[in-house]
């Protein structure tokens, strides 16, 4: 019983970390990386599809992405989708290749992004603490139904707290890496 609650809490905490990482991948640093365009979608034969299903995205160099739509007719559609995204990018098209230079981030923009990253980290920490609360309330429920002893409940709560500390520490470590990445010029 206690082990199941602990395993469930750990699985949910891992998912929170993955969701946090996914959110951070969407935040533009000064470097080019293919994940940057993951959340952009284009209209492909009347259906909204993720950009990576309508074009190949490659890193040309540290500050340039190249996007090659699978069909020539999609070039203007893809270019428009990139321009209208919230990333502030200006693509240039040469034939079927769309090049996206990464403009360097201004100091103000870097500070704004650090605030966004910290906010995302706090949301991840809150999610992890909520998982701890749920697990602890499950343990209390088992105690109330006399399925476990008070000592077992305390041991379970300690195990859940150790998991919480481990995963909030992971959030802090990821946050520090991202802040460092954002602040380097």
Swiss-Prot record:
Alphabetical list of Gene3D superfamilies matching this protein: 3.30.1360.40, Ribosome-recycling factor
SUPFAM superfamilies on file: Ribosome recycling factor, RRF
Gene Ontology MF, one: ribosomal large subunit binding
Location in or out of the cell: Cytoplasm
Gene Ontology terms: cellular component: cytosol
BP GO annotations: cytoplasmic translational termination
Record's keyword annotation contains Cytoplasm: yes
Record flagged with keyword Cytoplasm: yes
InterPro entries per the UniProt record, alphabetical: Ribosome_recyc_fac (IPR002661), Ribosome_recyc_fac_dom (IPR023584), RRF_sf (IPR036191)
Keywords: Cytoplasm, Protein biosynthesis
A Pfam family: RRF
Superkingdom as given in the UniProt entry: Bacteria
Role this protein plays: Responsible for the release of ribosomes from messenger RNA at the termination of protein biosynthesis. May increase the efficiency of translation by recycling ribosomes from one round of translation to another.
Family: Belongs to the RRF family.
Protein name: Ribosome-recycling factor
Source organism phylogeny: Bacteria, Pseudomonadati, Pseudomonadota, Gammaproteobacteria, Chromatiales
């Amino acid at each position: 019983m206690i082990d199941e609650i602990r395993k469930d809490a750990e699985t949910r905490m891992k998912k929170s970390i993955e969701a946090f990482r996914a959110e951070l991948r969407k935040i533009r640093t000064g470097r080019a990386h293919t994940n940057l365009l993951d959340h952009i979608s284009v209209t492909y034969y009347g259906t909204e599809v993720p950009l990576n299903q309508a074009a190949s995205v490659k890193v040309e160099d540290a500050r340039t992405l190249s996007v090659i739509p699978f069909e020539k007719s999609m070039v203007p559609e893809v270019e428009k989708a990139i321009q209208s995204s919230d990333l502030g990018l200006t693509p240039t098209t040469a034939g079927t290749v769309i090049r996206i230079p990464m403009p360097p981030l201004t100091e103000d923009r870097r500070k704004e992004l650090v605030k966004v990253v910290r906010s995302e980290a706090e949301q991840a920490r809150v999610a992890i603490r909520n998982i701890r609360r749920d697990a602890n309330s499950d343990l209390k429920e088992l105690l109330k139904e006399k399925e476990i002893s008070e000592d077992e409940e305390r041991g379970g709560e300690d195990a859940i707290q150790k998991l919480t500390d481990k995963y909030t520490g992971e959030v802090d470590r990821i946050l520090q890496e991202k802040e460092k990445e954002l602040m380097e010029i």
